[in-house]
Amino acid sequence: MLYPIFIFILAGLCEIGGGYLIWLWLREGQSSLVGLIGGVILMLYGVIATFQSFPSFGRVYAAYGGVFIIMSLIFAMVVDKQMPDKYDVIGAIICIVGVLVMLLPSRA
């Protein structure tokens, strides 16, 4: 189970990092090189997601969505210095429970 978690985290870092670089370019006036690097990192995110061991695209992306939410809240705390409120935390917990429900059962 460590490999899928590693892939989810790596994909999340690429999606959030790439998206943030594009945000900096388009919203905060950074150079187009920053945006280009963000685009390349976002492309890597799409490739990294295919390394998951789960056979179903839809299930992988649905489960990844829960991981993405948690990582986005952590990013907001570390980079934007915005602490999640109780509703953010409750929502994130609900999402992680959903991810576990999707991924943990053995399907025959």
Curated annotation (Swiss-Prot):
Pfam families in UniProt: UPF0060
- Coiled-coil segments, which residues? none
The topology of this chain with respect to the membrane is: Multi-pass membrane protein
One GO CC term on file: plasma membrane
Q: Does the keyword Cell membrane apply?
A: yes
| Compartment(s) | Cell membrane
InterPro entries per record:
UPF0060
- Sorted UniProt keywords: Cell membrane, Membrane, Transmembrane, Transmembrane helix
Annotated membrane-spanning segments are 5-25, 31-51, 60-80, 86-106
User: Mainly localized where?
Assistant: membrane
**Domain of life the protein comes from:** Bacteria
Keyword Membrane appears in the UniProt entry:
yes
Q: Tell me its family.
A: Belongs to the UPF0060 family.
**Can you name this protein?**
UPF0060 membrane protein SAR2425
Protein source organism: Staphylococcus aureus (strain MRSA252)
